[in-house]
A protein has these predicted regions:
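Conserved ABC transporter NBD signature motif
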Residues: 55-63
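Conserved coupling/switch loops of ABC nucleotide-binding domains, chiefly the family-specific signature
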Residues: 53-56, 206
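Helix-to-loop junction immediately C-terminal to a conserved catalytic motif
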Residues: 47
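ATPase nucleotide-binding modules
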Residues: 223-251
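ABC ATPase nucleotide-binding domains
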Residues: 73, 86-226
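The feature captures the beta-strand-to-loop junction immediately N-terminal to the Walker
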Residues: 32-34
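ABC ATPase nucleotide-binding domain helices that frame the ATP-binding cleft
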Residues: 40-43, 139
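Conserved beta-strand
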Residues: 4-7, 14-24, 55
Length: 251
C-alpha cells in the first residue's frame, strides 16, 4: 500500500536520510522516535507537502512521487487538529468534499456515515472553540475519513490530550481500525502508545529509520543501543573491553 524508497528530504539544517518503509494494505503502523527525529517530515512527505531531494513514494502500487497532494488519496490529522475556527463542525467535516465539488447527495451520505461512526450528531452546529480536546479530535478524524482516503496519516494524535481522554481516543482508534481497515501511519514520541496501537513499529532517530518490526521484536531484539534505550530496555550495562579473544570478547 505504501512504499517509501530511499527518501531524502532537506529542510534547513535537518535531513531525512535514505528512509525506506513498507506499509501493507490495511496495516496500522506506528512511527516512534524522539522530538526532532523526522517523524512529521516523513508523514508530510508522504502527503506530498515537501519536495524530495531523492527517493520514491508509491501508493497502491503506483508511483506518487510527483503527484500533487490533492491527487494522492491521503489525509492527515495533526496534533492541534487544524480545524477551521470560523466554520461549524458540519462545515469542517465536509470541507474536503466541497473542495472536490462532490455531488451534494454523496456529501450528505458521507457526512451521515462519519457522524454515526463517531457519535457526534449533537456537535454539528457548534464551533471548534466550544469543543473539548476529545471532541475536537473526533471531528478531525471524521473530517479525514469523510473523503474515504486510501491512507490515513496521524501526527501525534494523542499527545495534547489529558490521560483519560487519551485512553478514550486510543480505544476509538483501535475500534475504527477494526471496522474500516484503512491503511494507517501514526507517529508518536511515546513508545508505550506505539506498542498499544501498532501492528508493527518503525523506530526513527536523527533522520534515519533505525528498525522496523512487531512491537515484541523491537522490545526484545533491538538492533542498536539507540533502539534499546528508546524501547526502555533494562539490560543495557556499562562495560570495558579488556581483551578480544578468538570467537569471543572478555569484558
Amino acid at each position: 500500500m505504501i512504499s517509501i524508497r530511499n527518501l531524502c528530504v532537506e529542510l534547513g539544517d535537518f535531513t531525512l536520510k535514505n528512509a525506506s518503509l513498507e506499509v501493507s494494505d490495511g496495516e496500522y503502523m506506528v512511527v516512534v522516535g524522539p522530538s526532532g527525529a523526522g517523524k512529521t517530515v516523513l508523514l508530510e512527505s508522504i502527503a506530498g507537502l515537501y519536495p524530495l531531494r531523492q527517493g520514491e513514494i508509491w501508493l497502491r502500487g503506483k508511483e506518487a512521487t510527483q503527484l500533487r497532494p490533492e491527487y494522492r488519496q491521503v489525509t492527515i490529522v495533526y496534533q492541534d487538529h487544524a480545524l477551521f475556527p470560523h466554520l461549524s463542525v458540519r462545515e469542517n467535516i465536509v470541507f474536503g468534499l466541497r473542495m472536490r465539488k462532490t455531488d451534494p447527495n454523496q456529501t450528505r451520505a458521507a457526512l451521515e456515515r462519519v457522524v454515526d461512526l463517531f457519535g457526534i450528531s449533537s456537535l454539528l452546529h457548534r464551533r471548534p472553540a466550544t469543543l473539548s480536546g476529545g471532541e475536537r479530535q473526533k471531528v478531525a478524524l471524521a473530517r479525514a475519513l469523510c473523503v474515504s482516503p486510501d491512507v490515513l496519516l496521524l501526527d501525534e494524535p494523542l499527545s495534547s490530550l489529558d490521560p483519560q481522554t487519551r485512553e478514550d481516543i486510543q480505544e476509538e482508534l483501535q475500534r475504527l481500525h477494526r471496522m474500516l481497515r484503512v491503511t494507517t501511519l501514526h507517529v508518536t514520541h511515546n513508545f508505550e502508545e506505539a506498542v498499544a496501537l501498532g501492528e508493527r513499529i518503525a523506530v526513527i532517530g536523527e533522520g534515519e529509520v533505525k528498525q522496523v518490526g512487531p512491537p515484541e521484536e523491537i522490545f526484545r531484539r533491538p538492533n542498536s543501543e539507540f533502539v534499546a534505550r528508546f524501547a526502555m530496555s533494562r539490560n543495557i550495562f556499562p562495560g570495558v573491553l579488556c581483551r578480544p579473544e578468538a570467537g569471543n570478547c572478555r569484558f
